Swiss-Prot record:
The modification N6-(pyridoxal phosphate)lysine is found at residue 218. It comes from the Bacteria. Pathway: Amino-acid biosynthesis; L-histidine biosynthesis; L-histidine from 5-phospho-alpha-D-ribose 1-diphosphate: step 7/9. PANTHER family: HISTIDINOL-PHOSPHATE AMINOTRANSFERASE, HISTIDINOL-PHOSPHATE AMINOTRANSFERASE-RELATED. One of its GO terms (biological process) is L-histidine biosynthetic process. This is Histidinol-phosphate aminotransferase. It comes from Chlorobium luteolum (strain DSM 273 / BCRC 81028 / 2530).
Amino acid sequence: MQNDIHRHLNPALQKIGAYVVEGGQEAPVKLNQNESPFDVPMWLKEAITREFVREPWNRYPDILPYRGIEAYAEFLGVPAGRVIMGNGSNELLYTIFMACLGPGRRILIPEPSFSLYEKIALLMQADIVSVPMRRGLDFDADLILERAKAEAVDLIVLSTPNNPTGKSLSPDDIRRIATESGAIVLVDEAYIEFSRHPSALPLVDELPNVVILRTMSKALALAGMRIGFAIAPEALMAELTKPKIPFASNRLAEITLRHVLANYSIVKDSVSYILDERERMYSELEGMDGLQPFMSDTNFLIIRVADPRAVFQHLRGEGILVRNVSGYPLMEGCLRCNIGLRDENRRLLDGLSRALR
């Protein structure tokens, strides 16, 4: 009898699919993955590689990347015992979810949010409590808290500023949710450098159940290096890191991080450029017929059009990649485009104008 391999696999695999970037990852104007348009300057790459070639390549790195942890802790002004470094923030999502979830445990996820949250929760066979955003794509903090208490959830994950909506929760709302729900609250601040709201990082000093997640892939322009961090009270961090994969961060990532943090003015300049372009782009999009732009606290903008598939395909035909997010709840007709260089942004505006004629 032929063996059915599916009966040996996690049944949750039947509910999820492989991660796919629609349209691919290569285009003359690539605005679909919320990356920085600025690469690390060559002089800094050369300084990084000069140090890296002196490292032993035949030896494992430290079990945990202590040099990277200490550098980022010093940058934030927090004790190193509160910080963990991962191979991208996605690795830390898996780690934290494994520490908090399992069959019968409950996670609250505002909807829409980063798709990986639901995927990992399903793999962990957890029960998902979905809380919709408001019609304007803003968070409904009152409803989040109401459902968290009613469902006695174990973990709340808040992407703020949110991907894909671009909207934020205030630190006061996060404090209220964490205090009154009693659940562990994971605050994913992947886009915090672009936000009009301050970081929720000070809440780690105040509350025992708040975890902050950071990525170096957006503002720091290190998507290719895979560097992420979590910050939490030391007692909580000691538990969250138990499932962590050892040796997951390589020596090059640690060295790169230290050099970029030591030259942080480069990051500030690029963020300033992106924020200026974001405001200029939003203003121009507001004046265009046939679309509705949404205000954003991130390095991307959401626009709503009548036929997102047709507009997506038209732009792709012009060599411009954006993200079709119209399949997300409450985001019917929406496309997501990250802020690029000025010339790239101009090509996007011109392409949209032609697509909407």
